[in-house]
Amino acid sequence: MTVPEHPFGLMAKVYRDIFPLVHQELDIWKQKSESIHNSELKAQATASIRDKTFHCEGGGILALLSGSQKQKCVEFIIAYQTISDYLDNLCDRSTSLDPQDFRMLHASMQDALTVGAELQNYYQFREEQDDSGYLHELVKTCQRVLGSIEHYDMIKPYLLELCGYYCDLQVHKHVIEHERVPRLEKWFTQYESELPEMEWYEFSACAGSTLGIFCLVAYSFQPDFTESTAKKIRDSYFPYIQGLHILLDYLIDQEEDLLEGDLNFCSYYQSHEEMMDRLEHFIHKADEHLQGIPHENFHRLINRGLLGVYLSDDKVAGQKEMGRLAKKLIKASGKTSLFFYINGRAYRKFQKMSWMKNSKKKAQIIC
């Protein structure tokens, strides 16, 4: 299996081989989401695909590790990430703030990773019920792909472990506001002795990523995959790469989360300087934990790519202080991050131009 280990080669393969598959799958789920009967469930399902395409594109890159099974791997990644983004929307905009409801919704993610698990009524603790089979179809798609993987049993324990952290996080961070931090702090104490030194909000960030799951699934398509490789991937991605991923996500969303009253883990740092120090710590530790993993250079590119792609977001450019921090982080992490930063800015401009052209065409048709 040939895996790109240089930035230009990686981006060429991503644009040529991965993004078309990602958008093909997203189009399928977009059509299904538009057929949902319940108006609230439909609104959140369509919004999650429209507003969070970026998550699917990023996750899809790991399908490059699946060799000849890219189509199947992308199918899983998009279905699973779509569940994640959809449920996040439902919880973020929930009026119930009921932990039992959030726990039941996220049982779908654990079922999606458990081949043979029976489907449940994941909406049983909320008013909105009729999603026209949307969530069940997403779960079944994940199960079907995993069921076709010869080495599924080797990765299953790690998939469920990482998913367990994610689901616990989603429950605790969405409950009534005054309960969120105490619940997250208490949850952190359950695992603190097993973790490297970090704060509760950093552990929460480490729990909030799907990258480890995608990496495990992608590699497990390989005929020579082993249990030791599965363990190495888990240890390489959790906690540091996953933590860096989500801390960057929260970094660029700080202003938005403040306005909407959403929990933001980056806001718990005492100062911008402390936040910068810890982000740099996560960058270096992520690199350190990648030593000895198959295709080590590829994973280092992913690590640097996260920095470049997130920090090239328009939200960063629109905030003076954030822009200053972004430049400092890019400089500290080297030329590869700078490459991905420039590439990310260019890709976003291209997307805007495409959107403007399509909007003009639609306007002409209407006229």
UniProtKB/Swiss-Prot annotation:
Catalytic reactions on record? all-trans-heptaprenyl diphosphate = (R)-tetraprenyl-beta-curcumene + diphosphate
This enzyme's EC code(s): 4.2.3.130
Q: What class of enzyme is it?
A: lyase
Q: Which GO terms describe its molecular function?
A: lyase activity
Write the record's keywords in alphabetical order, separated by commas.
Lyase
Under InterPro entries, the record lists: YtpB-like
- Pfam families with a match to the protein in the record: DUF2600 (PF10776)
Top-level taxon: Bacteria
What function is annotated for this protein? Catalyzes the transformation of a linear C35 prenyl diphosphate chain to form tetraprenyl-beta-curcumene.
Of which family is this protein a member?
Belongs to the large terpene synthase family.
Mind telling me what this protein is named?
Tetraprenyl-beta-curcumene synthase
The root-end lineage is: Bacteria, Bacillati, Bacillota, Bacilli, Bacillales
- Supply the gene name: ytpB
